[in-house]
Amino acid sequence: MNFKRPLILISNDDGYQSVGIRTLASFLSDFAEVVICAPEGARSGYSCAFSASDELRLTQRNNIPNCEVWSCSGTPVDCVKIAFEQILKGHRPDLVLGGINHGDNLSLIHI
């Protein structure tokens, strides 16, 4: 990682392969170091959940050019926590982003 540019950590609840995260990362990688740690697949509705007892898998991916991409078997919260503890190893990101979301963010009040 080249820390002469801003460091941005991205996660989401739609997974590391989602169109939204790829679009956001591709745009930001022109002027920042981008690290992605997102779930292996869609975890909609799990944004505030975390894994208390499950063993988590962390896998490095290469699906987005000019970005360091990791997938995690856990929730979005697990992804950000693991990114801080294992991937960034003490380096503090300048910005942490979530998204771009696929679909609407609706709660029970809207259903």
Language-model-detected regions and their locations in the chain:
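Short, glycine-rich nucleotide/cofactor-binding loops
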Residues: 10-17, 105
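Conserved small/polar residues in nucleotide/adenosyl-binding loops
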Residues: 109-111
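Glycine/small-residue-rich loop that forms an oxyanion/phosphate-binding "nest" at active or ligand-binding sites
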Residues: 78, 93-95, 99-104
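Short beta-strand segments
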Residues: 11, 37-39, 98-101
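A cross-family phosphate/adenosyl-ligand binding-site feature
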Residues: 2-4, 8, 19-92
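A short glycine/serine-rich beta->alpha loop
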Residues: 66-69, 102-107
